[in-house]
Amino acid sequence: MPQLDINVDDAYDFYLKYLLDPTNNKAELYTKYGFSFPGIPPSDWELFGAILMRDRKNPRDTGADLLRHEVKSAGMRSSFEYQYHKYHGLDKLRDEANVDHLFFSYGDNYQNLDARLVDTRLLVPIFESWLPLLEMNYDLDGRQRFRKSVPYGFVVKNGLLLLSIREGKLIYAIGKDGS
């Protein structure tokens, strides 16, 4: 992994203003009127990742979320799902094997959050094991999607912890120089 130049300050500001506060307010309204809160949309996680990693959205319709990173989010201790659609799944899987992966784990109405970065070289064997399964899946009639997951334990063991938030407070952030 190259030297890190991450933007913790702006990412944490984004988290407070656009993820945590609005989410908690919306969650209360959803509950009050008997709805299940759907959570934070993927595009918000991708924007959060782009700010943190000083990256940009991938302009292509297929492939990784950002130019240099794939972004995943899941509840604390949950696996991270990867989903591949029939017509672009192979291209997406191949593209994701060429970028590092940013994993956000969250809990307690997003009050707690960890961000970890996993070098793509550690994920390539997993992606290679999925490739024949993905191809077989699409040979079956009616199959439009292929889903697999990277376990939380793998991410914790192999990922570099970039930041950690507890009860809405930033309690850990890796040095901006990557140390």
Question: What residue ranges belong to the model's regions?
Answer:
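Nucleic-acid endonuclease domains
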Residues: M1-R68, S73-S179
